[in-house]
């Protein structure tokens, strides 16, 4: 019986194929290489045990702070900046003061804008950070992110989107607000949606978009043991072009509280006919600032009901249904502050009455920023064909 089985052509082909697979496995270096073939590429090797200071190499940047604008006709910046250092140190203590952050970033212009002086940047990237009552986290992010991005030789601007009031936090809706307001300023090439408590650990993780589809950038967080928690995870830090953002109708507006919106967004990407790309695990390293659970950002009890409806609701819930009241647009020395009233959860309890800003929260922080603000210089209005993204609020 065994002999007849071995004489069958399909059995012989199976045996030959198995032998070839084993030979390939051994020639490529065993399990690690095989996993790189059939899993996700681990990418180049970096030594994270000897990180560089995040302010390394900034002295090599051309151009003096406050000098004349760069002349026209500059060559394009290199595709990969020669100023990159790889792994950088991330420290959560002490929390730097605003004065220290401003002093260490003299090339940053009002509104948190930067443009390299010696070459024409290949990408104009808007960093959009949803925020409420996380001042220490915000200072750590600003201290860390400005030099990180300057070494990449990008033109960039940082937008911090404050949710006014005491209602339930809505991260995804704040990101929609940030995208719309950022595109009123400039025709950005790339939109980086960035949680305030995540600090990048490797400047080879370029803050640029992929024209082929949305990028999920925070692929290896210390919170998850520097690995992706599950294949469709799209949380933390992501990057989309304005066209990609509009194609998926932006982010959902109905997720009040913690959880669910990341999975909804990943589903939108698929339903819009796009695919998620990621940097190698060895590059997309992030450290999360430790914090307790936020009051007003409790677990969303409706998230699973909303996820079930995503396939039918994504074309109606997003940028085309976004409503909010813009309360403030302020140019600080380190970022553009956008304060918006985005309403309250229609399914939850009514928000308690009180000041628009939680006690001890962003109001004092913002006032300190404004006291240090240089004279405001309004940016040019975009003439890009993103009318739907820049529509009225």
UniProtKB/Swiss-Prot annotation:
Residue numbers on the Cytoplasmic membrane side: 1-10
Enzyme Commission no: 2.4.1.-, 2.4.1.38, 2.4.1.90, 2.4.1.275
Region annotation Disordered: where it falls in the sequence: 339-393
Tissue: Found in various tissues. Highest expression in placenta, prostate, testis, ovary, intestine and muscle, and in fetal brain.
GO BP annotations, alphabetical order: carbohydrate metabolic process; galactosylceramide biosynthetic process; glycosylation; protein glycosylation
Subcellular location, principal: Golgi
Any Pfam family hit: Glyco_transf_7N
Topology feature Lumenal, residues: 32-393
Transmembrane domains' residue ranges: 11-31
Similarity comment: family membership: Belongs to the glycosyltransferase 7 family.
Protein name (record): Beta-1,4-galactosyltransferase 3
Source species of the chain: Homo sapiens (Human)
Gene that produces this protein: B4GALT3
